[in-house]
């Protein structure tokens, strides 16, 4: 049985089966070697410019949560779900009147936040408006079902 050779890792796999290949390709070392290879190729062709990386992680971004916690002066853990449920501050936008859960009122549109549609591809027409309206209706139906079951 032929062995699979990985050019990035410069090694042979013991078996040539799809499961072994898949687990190798998802492995930490393979991904590291893969990234290093293309980074080196980008540096060779002068494409690599570390100052233009759009998703650069800085200490400011990493410490944003701890700075916000210090500025609030609270020692409670903001990630604690139980405390958020008891707090009325955090649930203002999430509270839905259970008596209106069965009605088809559009008053709860203000409480739900919808993302804008993705931009269309150039040369192609926009999707039909029903796509966006159906998405709102699906979200309302899911919200109603979760509220009636709980």
Swiss-Prot record:
SMART domains: ZnF_U1. Pfam families: zf-U1. Residues 103-112 have a biased composition (Acidic residues). Residues 80-92 have a biased composition (Basic and acidic residues). It comes from the Eukaryota. GO terms for biological process: filamentous growth of a unicellular organism; mRNA 5'-splice site recognition; spliceosomal snRNP assembly. It is found in: Nucleus. GO terms for molecular function: mRNA binding; pre-mRNA 5'-splice site binding; U1 snRNA binding; zinc ion binding. Residues 115-130 have a biased composition (Pro residues). Residues 66-132 are annotated as: Disordered. U1 snRNP is composed of the 7 core Sm proteins B/B', D1, D2, D3, E, F and G that assemble in a heptameric protein ring on the Sm site of the small nuclear RNA to form the core snRNP, and at least 3 U1 snRNP-specific proteins U1-70K, U1-A and U1-C. U1-C interacts with U1 snRNA and the 5' splice-site region of the pre-mRNA. This is U1 small nuclear ribonucleoprotein C. The gene is YHC1.
């Amino acid at each position: 049985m032929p062995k699979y050779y990985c050019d990035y890792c410069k090694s042979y796999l013991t078996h040539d089966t799809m499961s072994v290949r898949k687990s190798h390709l998802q492995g930490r070392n393979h991904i590291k070697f893969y990234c290093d290879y293309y980074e080196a190729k980008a540096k060779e062709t002068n494409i690599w410019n570390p100052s233009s990386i759009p998703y650069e992680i800085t200490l400011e971004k990493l410490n944003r949560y701890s700075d916000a916690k210090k500025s609030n002066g609270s020692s409670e853990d903001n990630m604690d779900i139980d405390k958020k449920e008891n707090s009325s501050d955090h649930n203002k936008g999430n509270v839905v009147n259970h008596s209106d859960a069965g009605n088809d009122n559009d008053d709860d549109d203000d409480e739900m936040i919808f993302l804008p549609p993705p931009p269309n591809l150039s040369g192609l027409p926009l999707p039909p408006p029903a796509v966006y309206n159906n998405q709102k209706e699906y979200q309302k139906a899911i919200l109603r079902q979760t509220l009636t079951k709980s």
